[in-house]
């Protein structure tokens, strides 16, 4: 990109803010030696009576070791939706700026656009679920602040071609957000290792998918020091609670079990794909780098209701662009997948 300057993108009112600073930050190293009577907490120690570390230092340090990215390039949030919302609030002027999204894609980009009163310019993926570069560049205006790329994409499951992503990063002078919620199920490399090459790059990940902790709500954002510093100005002081910080550290110190689970899910994905090919009302199975499969069936609404009657909840995506008569199926355990295939076979014979 030419002459990229993050200070030209940030909202003026945000540029003048200072990040929240806890009065205790300067006493961190002294810890137990100090008597803390500053924050009106309950003084009786139960392990959770104190406010959590607002900078989540221990989690960032371990995550840095795991992902190979400096702690200074990491921001944590209450789920990925919070860090995505922070990007809107830091860089987009309500009623003036616009963002570009590529349907079919993750629905929260549009929701956050609407909440923040930002125009959402939708550019459909092509029929291979790949970005249409010509159409994207035609939609860019002087007020386009962000392009959102979900890769691996939800609901299609495919990873976008690296060459196309790189071209967007190089030609667009705004921010490019790559949502990698499903990256651990893919053989593609994460874009976090290209942060130094592209100052306009933001990558988001989550603990909800491969790490199996949707219940703790922890989202991760990786970007340049400058972008992280701007987002820290508007981040709520204690946005990641102590229980979440403790649980996330347990996960990061036990990644071998996570890797085994991911390998099992990928193996089940392959098995399930082959079995679904044999079902007569399944017309197409899309290639997936995620923990789900998008399949095309004869009548999605009918099949969705039939699975509900059998006690199996899947996702009907047929109301999304390019997804007519498509169902999205999460890869379950071996036992759950067997029940799913059994239901498919029963419906096939009805």
From Swiss-Prot:
Its cofactor is pyridoxal 5'-phosphate. Pathway: Amino-acid biosynthesis; L-histidine biosynthesis; L-histidine from 5-phospho-alpha-D-ribose 1-diphosphate: step 7/9. The keyword RNA-binding does not apply. The keyword Amino-acid biosynthesis applies. The modification N6-(pyridoxal phosphate)lysine is found at residue 209. Signal peptide: none annotated. It catalyses: L-histidinol phosphate + 2-oxoglutarate = 3-(imidazol-4-yl)-2-oxopropyl phosphate + L-glutamate. One of its GO terms (biological process) is L-histidine biosynthetic process. InterPro entries: Aminotransferase_I/II_large, HisP_aminotrans, PyrdxlP-dep_Trfase, PyrdxlP-dep_Trfase_major, PyrdxlP-dep_Trfase_small. Keywords: Amino-acid biosynthesis, Aminotransferase, Histidine biosynthesis, Pyridoxal phosphate, Transferase. GO terms for molecular function: histidinol-phosphate transaminase activity; pyridoxal phosphate binding. Pfam families: Aminotran_1_2 (PF00155). It comes from the Bacteria. Its EC number is 2.6.1.9. Belongs to the class-II pyridoxal-phosphate-dependent aminotransferase family. Histidinol-phosphate aminotransferase subfamily. Homodimer. NCBIfam families: hisC. This is Histidinol-phosphate aminotransferase. It comes from Christiangramia forsetii (strain DSM 17595 / CGMCC 1.15422 / KT0803).
